A protein has these predicted regions:
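Secretory targeting and sorting signals
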Residues: 1-16
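Zn2+-dependent metallopeptidase catalytic core
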Residues: 15-187, 195, 213, 425
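Non-catalytic C-terminal accessory/binding modules of secreted extracellular proteins
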Residues: 25-26, 32-36, 167-180, 184, ...
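Extracytoplasmic/periplasmic, Sec-exported soluble proteins
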Residues: 46, 118-122, 183-190, 220, ...
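Active-site-proximal beta-strand/loop segments in catalytic clefts of secreted hydrolases
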Residues: 55-60, 148-152, 204-207, 230-233, ...
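Short, solvent-exposed loop/turn elements at domain surfaces
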Residues: 61-66, 235-240, 358-360, 378
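Extracellular hydrolytic enzyme modules, especially secreted metalloproteases
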Residues: 139, 152-306, 310, 323-357
Length: 442
């Protein structure tokens, strides 16, 4: 660690190099690599407005029981609001839904739709969908394509919802279509499922662990702490590392901790969800301050709040407190992410998580610690949350994985990363709700 830190200091000495650069892992050939030194140009980068077309497909063996308008409302504006909050208003996903069903030429059962889909049947489905929709859609106008199947058709399987990356792009309207989102969700669908799948369109990996028999725990890697782990998570905002990758954090908001030994590096971490659309409201006013599901309203936070007297966490959460996050967390321009380089393809990351923005239903708050590996493929554990309280669990009724629900390091606590010699001390809270910490290495 000492040699690595010294190298990082030398690399960061030039004024032309942002101070976060030494901690930026190199992008590798791993599928959805967590490296972020460069952007993979095969994917659209969500740092601006992107347009998405929603195409609704019916089948000759079923009469739709829902309308395209109803299915659109299943996913929007919730999906757009999630990304506007997560990106601090830097990214807008604008949906363009068709208003009618487009008939497919074959019965829904003919495509053998399932989670691990036969590639030949899947290709046939995509070809048929493109032929059915091309007369009605100018694909050159859109950055994202959603093919939404009739949820009541007998051959439709909700487990098959996924992003399909095409080695040989489909071609329509002079445009190469390199990936599509195939939506087979029920009505109503799983919460935030379209946001999860759309994350793959932006080169984000799956963070869940799929058991060999599909019967064990899927959420052992990151628990509730990122949408790409579970759309059901209590704190589904994207990790700060992902926000850095997607271009939503300015370089000055990422602190690369380079000093080894000594007294460590002291800094203030602002809650990840604070700022931009998270404070102003994704769509402005009450509409932009969409509250999380009512079942979480009034639930007391676990793990100790550590807020200043009278601040959030000193009592119950009301519905007005769970939405956009305009709760005195500050303006949102401070440091969001601290990183320690631990190897050629690995880092330890630190970020403050609390009940603001997309994390309104968080179980416990504090400074979350996690490991990132750039050479680990999607689904293989490229991110692992490190549990500061391995002997306890929390929020058994609501959490997707209670053992990690209380993972953050709380006020007055310290945590040493096993095997790395990296130590975090959470010392204080500011009046605006930020966390004062010291990170030591060596």
């Amino acid at each position: 660690m000492t040699a690595l830190a010294a190298t990082s200091l030398a690399a960061g000495s030039s004024n032309a190099v942002p101070p976060s650069t030494p901690c930026a892992l190199k992008r590798t050939d791993a599928h959805h690599s967590e490296g972020l030194d460069t952007w993979n140009a095969a994917y659209p980068r969500p740092d601006r407005r992107l347009d998405a077309v929603m195409i609704f497909l019916s089948f000759p063996d079923s009469v739709p029981q829902t309308t395209p308008t109803e299915l659109t409302a299943d996913h929007f504006p919730a999906t757009s609001r999630f990304f506007e909050r997560a990106s601090y208003g830097k990214f807008t996903l604008r949906p363009h839904p068709l208003r009618e069903w487009l008939p497919m030429p074959r019965a829904s059962t003919a495509y053998a739709i399932k989670r691990d889909w036969n590639s030949a049947r899947r290709s046939a489905y995509l070809r048929d969908a493109l032929v059915a929709s091309d007369p009605r859609v100018d694909f050159s106008r859109y950055d994202v394509v959603y093919f939404v199947a009739d949820p009541d058709a007998p051959g439709v399987n909700s487990d098959a919802t996924k992003v399909v990356n095409l080695e040989a792009p489909l071609r329509a309207d002079g445009t190469d279509i390199r990936r599509v989102v195939t939506v087979f969700e029920r009505h109503p669908p799983d919460r935030l499922v379209l946001a999860h799948e759309t994350g793959h369109v932006f080169d984000l990996p799956d963070l869940y662990h799929r058991p060999a028999d599909d019967k064990g725990d899927w959420d052992t890697y990151v628990g509730d702490w990122d949408l790409m782990g579970s759309q059901f998570g209590l704190a589904p905002d994207l990790f700060g590392w992902h926000k850095w990758k997607l271009g939503w954090l300015d370089p000055r908001q990422v602190s690369c901790v380079q000093a080894a030994g000594g007294e460590g590096t002291r800094m203030t971490l602002e809650p990840l969800g604070a700022g931009g659309a998270a404070v102003a409201g994704a769509a402005g006013g009450a509409e932009g301050a969409e509250a999380v599901e009512s079942e979480f309203r009034g639930r007391r936070l676990g793990g100790g709040s550590g807020f200043p007297s009278g601040g959030l966490g000193s009592g119950e959460l009301g519905s007005s407190e769970l939405g956009s996050g305009g709760l005195g967390f500050g303006l949102g321009g401070g440091t969001k992410l601290a990183v320690v380089r631990t190897g050629r393809d690995s880092v330890i990351a630190f970020e403050a998580r609390g009940p603001v923005g997309n994390d309104g239903a968080v179980c416990s708050q504090g400074v979350l610690v996690y490991r990132v590996r750039s050479e680990t493929v999607s689904g293989g554990g490229p991110v692992e949350v490190l549990d500061a309280h391995p002997d306890t669990a929390a929020c058994w009724e609501d959490s997707v994985y209670p053992p990690l629900a209380d993972a953050p390091v709380g006020l007055g606590e310290s945590f040493t990363v096993p095997g790395e010699g990296v130590r975090l001390e959470v010392e204080d809270r500011t009046d605006s709700g930020a966390w004062t910490v010291t990170i030591s290495t060596g």
